Amino acid sequence: MSQPIQYLDVSENIPCSRCKTETAILISRKEKFCKDCFVRFIRGKQRKQMQDEKYKVKYGKNEENSPVQKVLLTLSCGVSSLVLVDVMTSLLKEQFDMHKGKQGFELVLLNINEYELKALDRSVKDVLEQLVQRFKPINITYKILSLESYVLDQSLLEKIVLNGDFTAYSQSIHHDRDYTLSEVLDLCPNKSSLEDLLTIIYDELILRTACLESCETILYGHSMTRIANEIIALTVKGRGSSIYQTVSDHSVNFRNKDYKIIFPLRDVLFAEILAYSKLSELDTFAVESTKPVSKITKNMTIRDLTTNYFNQLDATGYASTASTVVKTGDKLGAPKFEEDSSICQVCGTEIHQDPKEWLRRITVNKAAPLETEEEKEYAEQYKKASSLIEEPSSTQSKTPINICYGCTVTISGIKNESGFIWPIKYPANDEEREILNEYILTDDEDDQ
């Protein structure tokens, strides 16, 4: 099997299959490309995903009646998101040149500060300033957001417990001090639980930012390989009902307003992303984690394992498997049930079928009778270690909450005397309970 990208020897002067004049430098999808044609090919994938009139320059009545769109681009300063920034600014540059300084939309870059979390090799703020200079005269604004801003209202924090039949309850905690997000995440027993909770945090912060910045469109730089990775990871984590939102463009309702989520690079393999980055000299802007990556399987997160799987497929010439996975996932629509759905009060996802009923059917809840003193001693040790698993009789002064299967799995793995503390979502009075005026976004926040 051939590699997804094959670089050619330019001394052989093999003509480009597209323009027929320039020398081809690589082969992708069995086609020979010169540098300019390959860059144009990748940019064309983004244009295909964003053909809506609202992203085009408007004149006359259309300009008066339709304000300029604001588009939020999530930027981690990884290779994929950097390529997406380059692709989007190339579109804006074309509009700027063809329409005498006009742009069809305003681009807002959002970076969620991971400097300490991932031990990044440099400040993202410095990179963002360099990017703004690189793409002048295109007007780009950027925001750097702290992870700690996820917990704005301490009164929303409550302790969550699960009893033996998988019913979840929330319990008020003493607010004699403020809890930081770092303290909450420190309760995670493993990297997979931490990864799952961080995904919930990122999604929420991105939607909050889109709301406050009046951005109606949100762009993710996920490649086809990344989307295939997410499909497998979501399946393993028990979040299969969310796959349809990960695979294709869709709308999300947040605070009674719809936001369009678009994956402009969903038709591009990660190997092609790397080639584009190399040819466009974007590698110098990439920010990487300095944390050593574990090679021991048990120390890897679910996403680490699925990423390694697709990396091996790329290395062995089976990169097209990602396309098959995405096409299969693309056939999955939103779950359809006649019963009324509810909202998970941990992650906010829609619950179409109560996971408790299914878990009770497949789980043996009653243990065999304890016969020896040793067995009784082990049972007591287990009860002390499993502080989040409580018996139904101890549910007084606790409020039942709705929780999805994925969050049930994540929370049940957390064992700590303080329990699992998390900001509970209350859909009925969400806007009243959250403190929007304390949510501060700046484009000059210190990244460290």
UniProtKB/Swiss-Prot annotation:
Keywords: Cytoplasm, tRNA processing. Its main location: cytoplasm. It is found in: Cytoplasm. One of its GO terms (biological process) is invasive growth in response to glucose limitation. One of its GO terms (cellular component) is cytosol. Pathway: tRNA modification; 5-methoxycarbonylmethyl-2-thiouridine-tRNA biosynthesis. GO terms for molecular function: nucleotidyltransferase activity; sulfurtransferase activity; tRNA binding. Plays a central role in 2-thiolation of mcm(5)S(2)U at tRNA wobble positions of tRNA(Lys), tRNA(Glu) and tRNA(Gln). May act by forming a heterodimer with NCS6 that ligates sulfur from thiocarboxylated URM1 onto the uridine of tRNAs at wobble position. Prior mcm(5) tRNA modification by the elongator complex is required for 2-thiolation. May also be involved in protein urmylation. Belongs to the CTU2/NCS2 family. This is Cytoplasmic tRNA 2-thiolation protein 2.
